[in-house]
C-alpha cells in the first residue's frame, strides 16, 4: 500500500504523515508549484509538484495510484476515478468514499453547479473542526495496516 494525498488544500497532512511514517507506509503529497515549500519531510514522504492547472494534481495521482492504494482528497471527481481503479479513498473530514455514496456526492455537486450557473448562491462547506480531524485520524488509522 502507498498513500497519495491531494495536498493543495488538505488540512490533515500532519496526521497522514505522522500515522503513515509510524506504520512505515510511503506517502506521496501531490501539490501545485504555487504551494512550493523547502520544508524537509520525514523519511518515506515524497512531494511531487505539478502545474497549477485545473485537475493537474488529480491526473498525476491517477497516473501513480495502483489498486488498494489509499488516496486522501476532497475532490469527488478524483474520488470517483480512484474508486473505479480499486483504491481506498478518504475525505479529510473523516468519511470514506464508496461505490455506494459517490454517485450521490457527484449528483449533489452537479446540482449545486447548476444553481450557481443560474446566478443563485449555494452554501459552502462547513468549517473544518478539531472533531473532524480526530474523526479522520480514527478512520485513517483503521485503514492502514499496523
Curated annotation (Swiss-Prot):
Pfam families: DUF188
Domain of life: Bacteria
InterPro entries: UPF0178
Protein family membership: Belongs to the UPF0178 family.
Listed HAMAP family: UPF0178
UniProt cross-references to PANTHER family, sorted A to Z: UPF0178 PROTEIN YAII
Protein name as it appears in the record: UPF0178 protein BT9727_2823
Organism from which the protein derives: Bacillus thuringiensis subsp. konkukian (strain 97-27)
Taxonomic lineage of the native organism: Bacteria, Bacillati, Bacillota, Bacilli, Bacillales
